[in-house]
């Protein structure tokens, strides 16, 4: 029989956050099992390979071409401004294939870059340096982090911030990722200019994904997959009402240069490298913490 305890922290019926299931790698000691965990690299978004095969990508080609037709016919729930921007890239007949091919190239670059920068001749490869932000996990249980080679204090004394760049930054520099900074996980004051500069230079030079004007950044590709599914239901006469019609977009966008906040379909007014994405649920907090100013369209002035 134990004595009654007087400390209450988690009321009955509540539970700790879950990260789902993970593969056990080994057990170091009694209280230290090691698991395998995926990392979602912060502030970057590489092309998707969810089509899995060239045939799967070709199927997306057809879906997006069909979506372009529905947009022409006014059947898709999308604003005229964003539709005008996206339509030419959806109507190419190769939007899915382009995304898949770019995704494979981005993966190959990332693998080669990691192996090269971690390698030490005659020694074991370097460990990874991992830095997380105030929101350590995403909704899929992935660790949100910046990763880089782990250098010794002596080595760090001789390296500039650019020379000890994160693998996240390397993807932007090579043009194999679109910048994807999401509040509140914003790089620090010394790192954010590096990120913006790398992304701007890659886009201006037409490297990586920016070599093709028909490129859909991965966040647009995912949104268009959702918009296709919603529009397909609408065309089929299935009931899609209210907020469900616009479930394909749930992020606002702030311009890092002016702190102006734009609606979910007005991000085209901001160059990709200056886009700060904000989930709808976080808009109030972002406006308060960053002193954002609503764009005229958000307050009915345009």
Indicate residue ranges for each PLM-predicted region.
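Small beta-barrel nucleic-acid-binding modules, primarily SNase/OB-fold domains
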Residues: 1-302
């Amino acid at each position: 029989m134990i004595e009654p305890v007087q400390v209450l922290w988690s009321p009955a019926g509540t539970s700790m956050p879950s990260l789902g299931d993970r593969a056990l790698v080994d057990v170091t000691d009694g209280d230290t099992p090691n698991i395998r965990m995926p990392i979602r690299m912060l502030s970057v978004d590489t092309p998707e390979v969810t089509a899995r095969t060239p045939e799967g990508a070709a199927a997306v080609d057809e879906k997006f071409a069909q979506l372009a037709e529905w947009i022409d016919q006014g059947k898709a729930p999308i604003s005229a401004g964003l539709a005008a921007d996206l339509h030419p890239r959806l109507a190419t007949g190769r939007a899915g294939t382009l995304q898949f091919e770019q995704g494979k190239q981005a993966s190959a670059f990332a693998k080669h870059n990691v192996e090269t920068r971690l390698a030490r001749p005659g020694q074991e490869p370097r460990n990874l340096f991992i830095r997380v932000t105030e929101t350590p996990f995403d909704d899929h249980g992935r660790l949100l982090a910046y990763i880089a080679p782990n250098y010794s204090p002596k080595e760090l004394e001789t390296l500039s911030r650019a020379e000890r760049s994160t693998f996240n930054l390397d993807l932007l520099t090579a043009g194999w990722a679109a910048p994807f900074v999401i509040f509140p996980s914003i790089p620090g004051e010394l790192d954010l200019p590096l990120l913006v500069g790398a992304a701007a230079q890659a886009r201006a030079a037409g490297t990586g994904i920016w070599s093709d004007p028909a490129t859909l950044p991965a966040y647009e590709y995912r949104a268009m997959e959702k918009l296709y599914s919603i529009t397909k239901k609408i065309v089929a006469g299935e009931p899609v009402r209210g907020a469900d019609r616009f479930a394909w977009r749930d992020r606002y966008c702030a311009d890092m240069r002016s702190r102006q906040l734009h609606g979910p379909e007005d991000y085209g007014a901001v160059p990709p490298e200056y886009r700060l994405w904000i989930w709808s649920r976080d808009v109030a907090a972002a406006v308060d913490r960053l002193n954002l100013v609503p764009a005229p369209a958000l307050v009915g002035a345009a």
